[in-house]
């Protein structure tokens, strides 16, 4: 029996909840993975997994064995890297998940420079706005915007981007400018679709906080589409500066109600809460943290 392979398949079976998913990762068949699990259970003399037609769950013994198996795989990976002299030479695949707009607009250049620096590393970038399960989906690093973070991940604050109300000068010439937050209801407000707060907008100015109702007929589920719509004169929007700083600098957009702003948007770097993290992933985390700190539209990471 290939013990290391069996342990790896068992660990991923617990994490993915599916032998078929493990087979796809291992580029083999589901019956092959089933045989590996059966052989491992015979070797140990205990049942590790409870199988049904709809689910796969570890038994109590399987849950305890899972933690030990993780440690064994960690030690094995470290020993192999040391034996091959690769402890200082990153190599292998890094799977990265990021919000679609941030990944498309800002992340590509950062990853390209990392690949140029480390020619033995491969990166798979998954752009998706949903909250992915890092372990189940085999993600090494995830970038998450906002304050909601998964409890089972290690989070590192990479930056904070202020959020300002902005509009194109052409729109403001046509419609005028709101003089106070409550007047936003009289203007075309472009917002992100599916927000929990709906048309409610929370703004602050120093110690003052106002909750205002906005009106708008256009809602978009992609930040770059909001950026384009605002630049085209479609209305007023509340945007993080990483998304629009260049347009503000060029004059394509201007601030509206400049004394007021929204809650700053935090950007975190996440990694699975396992003890072992490959060198390639650690280096990319550090690289991304440095690059994000230099992006236009990010400010002191402690201001949140």
Where are these regions (language model features)?
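A short LG(V/I)-centered, amphipathic sequence patch enriched
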Residues: 41-58
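Hydrophobic hinge/microswitch elements
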Residues: 211-255, 262-264, 273, 282
């Amino acid at each position: 029996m290939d013990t290391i392979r069996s342990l790896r398949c068992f660990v991923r079976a617990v994490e993915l909840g599916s032998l078929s998913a493990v087979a796809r990762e291992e580029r083999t068949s589901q019956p092959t993975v089933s045989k590996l699990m059966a052989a491992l259970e015979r070797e140990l003399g205990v049942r590790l997994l409870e199988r049904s037609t709809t689910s796969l769950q570890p038994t109590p013994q399987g849950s305890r064995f899972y933690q030990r198996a993780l440690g064994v795989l960690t030690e094995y990976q470290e020993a192999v890297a040391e034996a091959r002299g690769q402890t200082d030479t990153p190599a292998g695949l890094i799977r990265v998940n990021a919000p679609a707009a941030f990944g498309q607009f800002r992340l590509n250049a950062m990853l390209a420079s990392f690949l140029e620096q480390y020619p033995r590393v491969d990166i798979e970038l998954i752009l998706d706005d949903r909250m992915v399960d890092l372990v189940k989906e085999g993600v090494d690093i995830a970038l998450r915007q906002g304050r909601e973070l998964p409890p089972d991940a290690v989070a590192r604050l990479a930056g904070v981007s202020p959020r300002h109300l902005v509009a194109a000068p052409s729109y403001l010439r046509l419609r005028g400018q709101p003089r106070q937050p409550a007047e936003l209801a009289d203007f075309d407000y472009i917002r992100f679709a599916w927000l929990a707060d709906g048309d409610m907008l929370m703004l602050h100015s120093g110690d003052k906080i106002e909750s205002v109702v906005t009106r708008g007929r256009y809602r978009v589920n992609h930040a770059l589409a909001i950026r384009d719509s605002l630049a085209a004169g479609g209305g007023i929007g509340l945007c993080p500066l990483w998304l629009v700083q260049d347009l503000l600098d060029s004059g394509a957009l201007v601030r509206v109600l400049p004394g007021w702003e929204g809650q700053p948007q935090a950007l975190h770097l996440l990694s699975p809460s396992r003890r072992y993290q490959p060198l390639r992933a650690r280096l990319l985390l550090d690289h991304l943290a440095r690059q994000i700190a230099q992006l236009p539209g990010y400010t002191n990471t402690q201001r949140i």
